[in-house]
């Protein structure tokens, strides 16, 4: 979920489970974490583990009728921009579901301790005029410093074809990913270099 998009990738990762990843602390409260502005950055790796497509993203969460509405915009290194709106319903007994305009069916998942796992099928923009339908498995882990890390296993025609690595950090909306990119001459790559040097 949430910056978990990819294309023409391959991964050698072994299958993960929430039981194998979860720890008791810190407790990951998805609704609380994604309230307000959250920024994401990450990359897609090919079958040899080489990064092929970088991205950054802005997320804005608002609680509505007990659910979290999450507005996501991703900016890719090939100048493709992708937006979607999520509605996340955190249920009892460690389960949740989510809907989005990009999903085929609903996303479903579980959460425990500092971890969350989710599976879904999504239409992903791989170019401005082309989409693929991909299966996704997300594994999110909240770290002691309250940064959030996500590994997404990606499937096409039932075969795992890639992995996405994403890190989320809370922000106050004063510096959005979109603004960092657009104010830097030279575009996305220049903006990434500037962010790393800061």
Task: Walk through the language-model features, giving the residues of each.
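Amphipathic hydrophobic-ligand
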Residues: 51-57, 131-136, 160-162
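Bacterial Sec signal peptide processing site at the extreme N-terminus
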Residues: 7-27
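Sequence-level preference for short, compositionally simple segments enriched
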Residues: 17-19, 57, 63-64, 138, ...
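Glycine-rich, aromatic-bearing surface loops/beta-hairpins
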Residues: 137-198
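Surface-exposed interaction patches
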Residues: 108, 116-139, 145-152
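Central antiparallel beta-sheet cores of small beta-barrel/beta-sandwich binding domains
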Residues: 41, 46-127
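N-terminal export leaders
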Residues: 1-2
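Post-signal peptide N-terminal segment of mature Sec-exported envelope proteins
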Residues: 22-41
